[in-house]
Structures are given as structure tokens and as C-alpha cells.
From Swiss-Prot:
Binds 1 Mg(2+) ion per subunit. Binds 1 thiamine pyrophosphate per subunit. HAMAP family: DXP_synth (MF_00315). Its cofactor is Mg(2+); thiamine diphosphate. This is 1-deoxy-D-xylulose-5-phosphate synthase. NCBIfam families: dxs (TIGR00204), PRK05444.2-2 (NF003933). Its EC number is 2.2.1.7. It is an enzyme of class 2 (transferase). Catalyzes the acyloin condensation reaction between C atoms 2 and 3 of pyruvate and glyceraldehyde 3-phosphate to yield 1-deoxy-D-xylulose-5-phosphate (DXP). Keywords: Isoprene biosynthesis, Magnesium, Metal-binding, Thiamine biosynthesis, Thiamine pyrophosphate, Transferase.
Length: 633
């Protein structure tokens, strides 16, 4: 079959199971070949081929609603709904999104990227369906990893209480990105080995009906026996007690089992949970045998060997630099512990976990819990390092405010993937953290210009004993600069002048410093002398240096790879307003008031006007203007 010519999933209705098996194999070959060139979430998608095909054959999308939790496993869904012809553009600028996208297809009814949201969305859709009097099926598909998220458990509780008709597909592959952890994961493990729940339940019901209805103590004893037998023999009682009809576990690669149970679920009133066992990476040995999460999402790779295509002589990643520096310091300070919400591989904490297993806590997809657990550790004079992506820190905002900063606890927050991340798009860009952190009392916020300064900032954060401190660092590799052998501490709230200048000042930090220096070099050729300041402390500001700059009356350009509204540039405007009686000449560059889609970071920066050429253009506009004299002149 020509996968690129598929227009909609209606053709599946006429295929036999044997033909579906052939289609499954063809889709897997297509995914393995295509993703070897572009990269993407190969592991999750290889695992849900049969499940996705079965869902589209049994139900009628888009009338029936599929909600793909997290959404990285939606590639097969995209192929079956007519987007194969655009698959070569996957995760590229203006191309197919790597996650469900409502404006991309009518079959994408729920946008995702973060985990554990599908059940709440499904509850809303089911409530709307019932209010409108329609009869479509609502089918959220959630992984066993996402099920550990608190929001998913809140939704299970509410759905069970409301008894809305809904078919929840639990896609159980024993992993989220890294292997799953926690009591719920252990419970699901017991379910996997317990056999067919519905068969056992039906047999028990038959047995119970044969117990004679008698009065008094004997009747009460019989009821207790029934209840005890249920809990002893039927592991699905967890979901049943929440109000769900539990079906499974089902082989997620068997069409016979999938169709039998989906048809049973369609006839069942109230919420149903169908427990489907799948193999992440199925059909491609390197991905299928992956135990660490390496093949969850990848860059390009060689199909025959499974080797990843890496840039030559790349510097170590920022995640490695930070985690390894923390690991080094942990050898000297037994109070240092590390916490990650299900991202030990992405945060490069495998080495720390191997050396200090008792001081490493992977709490699962539970960012709120991770933040407050860090606070609890800090109250006992421990030194918690909370490794978390910028985009996921959004989910723990209240805990950072209420539990960490309000109590002024010594928690080191390592904000990974800060700034634009590229191909994962809107849901993963790390551009909001400055705006939602800098106004919180007690918190120090900083970002290094390179990996050498980065290791010193990690040391500074670990040695800091006056409250919470956060360090932003980008996705990808460092610049390859020379590294100091001895770690230093950087005075809190101090900036540094990287290049002198007398006509204008650029205040920036982190990833935008090389661009600012390159622009200043070009402008020097035109006779414009531009000072470049490494404003490495976003909070607190270096007030002494900033006052000196304002007193000089020079025009200022702030640059940040983060949202402008409420960001670093805003803090400079606020400071200038509070300390001067006139409006200073200050221009700001940063992320505009919009969600930034997927594409290469370079392409995205070009699109929003954050290139070296844009810096040069803005400085040219600033420098001809006659500047005011500063305070005390």
C-alpha cells in the first residue's frame, strides 16, 4: 500500500486481520526509514501501530474523539488520517508537528505535548457531549508513565464519580521516557502478570451466584468471603473501586484481542479502562531492547547499526556539564541529593544515580511533588538539586512559590532546555521561566555565557545558603571553551563587561552573548563603539553597574531568548523608571507575544527577528539619537 496516498482511515473497515498485519509491518518500515533521516519519537510510535490501526478501524474519527496523551505517539494516527504526503516535513519549520495539532487535521481534537492531560480533556468532552445530547465515543489514550501524573489521577477520580461513558485506553509499555517508577507502576506490573481480569471476574460472579442467599451471620460471612476473593484474585479492583469497568490486560499487538475488547468496551455503560500491553520500539531491535529511554526520541541514526549520527567533535552537552559538576560536588558534600521528574536520561543524571543511588530520586511524572519534596529535604539541611526542564517547571509554579521560595529554602533548581528548543515546538519551548520566576521573593536566577562559567555557577548554587537559587541552561552542547580546573564561586548579583564601548550598551546573557559580540564587532567597523555586558544574574540585577550605565546616558539594548513581557528587559525598564526622572533610551529584543512553533532554532530566531543582523539594525537606530545625561551629571 502507498502510505503517502492515504486520505482517511475509512479504508481500514474493509481489511482483514491478515491485511492489517501487513499494513502494520509496512508502517513500521516507513517509520524506521523516515525517522532515521529526520529523527523523532521512534520508540513510542513503533509500539502503538496495531493499537492505532485497531482504534481507527473500530471507531469513526473525527466523530469519535481520540485524545493522545503527551502526543509523541501520534505519528501512526497522522499517517492514517491523510498526512503521509507531508511526513518528510515532520518537526520541520512550517511542516507537520510532532504532536497532535488542531489546525493540522480535524482528526486531532486535543493538542498535547505535556503529559497526563488527556483524561481531564476527555471528561470535558464527555460532559459537553451529554449536554448536547450527541452520542460520539470519547477515547483518551494514556501511557502507564503519564498515569502516574497527579492530574491524571484527579481525572480518574472525577470520571469514576460522574460515570460518564468513556473508553480509556491504558497503553502500558512499562516506560514513559525512562523506565517508570512508583507504586502505580508496581501495581500495573502485577496486573500484567495476573491474567485476563474480565474472565476471572465473570467466573467469580458465576461462583458467587451459586452461594445461597441465607440470613443472619452466615449471609454476612458469605459477603465477606466474596469481597476477600475479589481482592485476592482480581487485581483490577483498583480501577473498579474508582468506578471503571476494567478490561485486560490485552496484547496490544494482537488484532484479535484488541477488536474483541474494544467491541466489548463499546457496549459497556459508564467509564471503561482497557489495559493494553505494548512493546515500546517494537519491530526495530535497538529501540525494542532499549532499557534506559535512549530510543524514546532521537536524532538521525543508521538503520543497520542503530548508531546515532552525531556532529563531529561536539562539546559535552549542557545537561552533562551541570549534572557532572553536581556529581563532583556531591563527593565532597553528603547533603547533596538529586531529584528528577522522570527525566534521568535527558538530564544526564545516570552517573549521579550510579555513584549515589541512595541520594538520587526519580519521582516519575510528578513535577509538583518533585518541587515540594525538594523543599522538604531542604528543611532538614539537605542540599537538593532539582533537575527539571523549563517547560515542565511551569507545572510546579505554585510549589516553587509556596513551598520553596516562601520558606526561603536552600533548593538549587537546574532549569534545563531554557530558551528555544526547536523541533518539539510550542509545548516545549523554554521561554516563560524568566517571566514567571523573577517576581518571586527570595529567588536568585542566573544563566551562564558558556560552560566554564556554567560549572562555576553550579558551584555557586550548591554553596549558596541564603535561599533558593535557579540556573537556566540551554538544550544542546556547550561552546567548547577551555575549562578551569578549580571551581570558583561567583558573587551573587554581579555582571561582567565582555567588551568595552562608549556609544551603546547591550545587556544580555546565556545563548545570545555570542550573537551580541559578533554584532558589536561588525558595528565597530562602522565606527560604532558598543559595550557588551554579560548580565548573568537576571535576579538580582547588578544595580551598581546598571546605575553607572544609566548615568552615562547611553542607549541600551536588552536581548533575551525568552518572552519579552515580564522578562529581563522589563526588569531593566522598571529599574530605569524607578531611578531616573526621564524615559531612558532602552530597546528590547526577545520572544514576542506568541507561541513559537517547531523548527530549527536558527530558523525560529530568524523568523522572530533575533539574529546578528537584527542586533546591528537596532543599534544603528539607537546610536544616532542624542542621549540624555544621567543622574548626577
Amino acid at each position: 500500500m502507498d502510505l503517502l496516498s492515504i486520505k482517511d482511515p475509512a479504508f481500514l473497515k474493509n481489511l482483514s486481520n491478515e491485511e492489517l498485519e501487513s499494513l502494520s509491518a509496512e508502517i513500521r518500515r516507513f517509520l524506521i526509514e523516515t525517522l532515521s533521516e529526520s529523527g523523532g519519537h521512534i520508540g513510542p510510535n513503533l509500539g502503538v501501530v496495531e493499537l492505532t490501526i485497531a482504534l481507527h478501524k473500530e471507531f469513526d474519527s473525527p466523530k469519535d474523539k481520540f485524545l493522545w496523551d503527551v502526543g509523541h505517539q501520534s505519528y501512526v494516527h497522522k499517517l492514517l488520517t491523510g498526512r503521509g504526503k507531508d511526513f518528510a516535513t515532520l518537526r520541520q519549520h512550517k511542516g507537520l508537528c510532532g504532536f497532535p495539532k488542531r489546525n493540522e487535521s480535524e482528526h486531532d481534537v486535543w493538542e498535547t505535548g505535556h503529559s497526563s492531560t488527556s483524561l481531564s480533556g476527555a471528561m470535558g468532552m464527555a460532559a459537553a457531549r451529554d449536554l448536547k445530547g450527541t452520542n460520539e465515543y470519547i477515547i483518551p489514550i494514556i501511557g502507564d508513565g503519564a498515569l502516574t501524573g497527579g492530574m491524571a489521577l484527579e481525572a480518574l477520580n472525577h470520571i469514576g464519580h460522574e460515570q460518564k461513558d468513556m473508553i480509556v485506553i491504558l497503553n502500558d509499555n512499562e516506560m514513559s521516557i525512562a523506565p517508570n517508577v512508583g507504586a502505580i507502576h508496581s501495581m500495573l506490573g502485577r496486573l500484567r502478570t495476573a491474567g485476563k481480569y474480565q474472565w476471572v471476574k465473570d467466573e467469580l460472579e458465576y461462583l458467587f451466584k451459586r452461594i445461597p442467599a441465607v440470613g443472619g451471620k452466615l449471609a454476612a460471612t458469605a459477603e465477606r468471603i466474596k469481597d476477600s476473593l475479589k481482592y485476592l484474585l482480581v487485581s483490577g479492583m483498583f480501577f473498579e473501586e474508582l468506578g471503571f469497568t476494567y478490561l485486560g490486560p490485552v496484547d496490544g499487538h494482537s488484532y484479535d484481542e484488541l477488536f474483541e475488547n474494544l467491541q466489548y468496551a463499546k457496549k459497556t455503560k459508564g467509564p471503561v479502562l482497557l489495559h493494553v500491553i505494548t512493546k515500546k520500539g517494537k519491530g526495530y531491535k535497538p529501540a525494542e531492547t532499549d532499557k534506559t529511554g535512549t530510543w524514546h526520541g532521537t536524532g538521525p541514526y543508521k538503520i543497520d547499526t542503530g548508531d546515532f549520527v552525531k556532529p563531529k567533535a561536539a562539546a559535552p552537552s549542557w545537561s552533562s556539564l551541570v549534572s557532572e559538576t553536581v556529581r563532583k560536588l556531591a563527593r565532597e558534600d553528603e547533603r547533596i541529593v538529586a531529584i528528577t521528574p522522570a527525566m534521568p536520561v535527558g538530564s544526564k543524571l545516570e552517573g549521579f544515580a550510579s555513584e549515589f543511588p541512595e541520594r538520587m530520586f526519580d519521582v516519575g511524572i510528578a513535577e509538583q511533588h518533585a518541587a515540594t519534596m525538594a523543599a522538604g529535604l531542604a528543611t532538614q539541611n539537605m542540599k537538593p538539586f532539582l533537575a527539571i526542564y523549563s517547560t515542565f517547571l511551569q507545572r510546579a509554579y505554585d510549589q516553587v512559590v509556596h513551598d520553596i521560595c516562601r520558606q526561603n529554602l536552600n533548593v538549587f533548581i537546574g532549569i534545563d532546555r531554557a530558551g528555544l528548543v526547536g523541533a518539539d515546538g510550542e509545548t516545549h519551548q523554554g521561554v516563560f521561566d524568566i517571566a514567571f520566576l523573577r517576581h518571586i521573593p527570595n529567588l536568585v536566577l542566573m544563566m551562564p555565557k558558556d560552560e566554564n562559567e556554567g560549572q562555576h555557577m553550579v558551584n555557586t548554587a550548591v554553596k549558596y545558603d541564603d535561599g533558593p537559587i535557579a540556573m537556566r541552561f540551554p538544550r544542546g552542547n556547550g561552546l567548547g571553551v577551555k575549562m578551569d580546573k578549580e571551581l570558583k564561586t561567583i558573587p551573587i548579583g554581579t555582571w561582567e563587561v565582555l567588551r568595552p564601548g562608549t556609544d551603546a550598551v547591550i545587556l544580555t546573557f546565556g545563548t545570545t552573548i555570542p550573537m551580541a559580540l559578533a554584532a558589536a564587532e561588525e558595528l565597530q567597523k562602522e565606527g560604532r563603539s558598543v559595550r557588551v555586558v554579560n548580565a548573568r544574574f537576571i535576579k538580582p540585577l547588578d544595580e551598581n553597574m546598571l546605575k553607572e550605565i544609566l548615568n552615562e546616558g547611553l542607549p541600551i539594548l536588552t536581548i533575551e531568548e525568552a518572552v519579552l513581557q515580564g522578562g529581563f528587559g522589563s526588569s531593566i525598564l522598571e529599574f530605569a523608571h524607578e531611578h531616573q526622572s526621564y524615559s531612558p533610551i532602552i530597546d528590547r529584543m526577545g520572544i514576542p507575544d506568541q507561541f513559537i512553533e517547531h523548527g530549527s532554532v536558527a530558523k525560529l530566531l530568524e523568523e522572530i527577528g533575533m539574529t546578528k543582523e537584527d542586533v546591528i539594525r537596532r543599534i544603528r537606530l539607537l546610536t544616532p539619537v542624542k542621549t540624555h545625561k544621567g543622574i548626577g551629571s
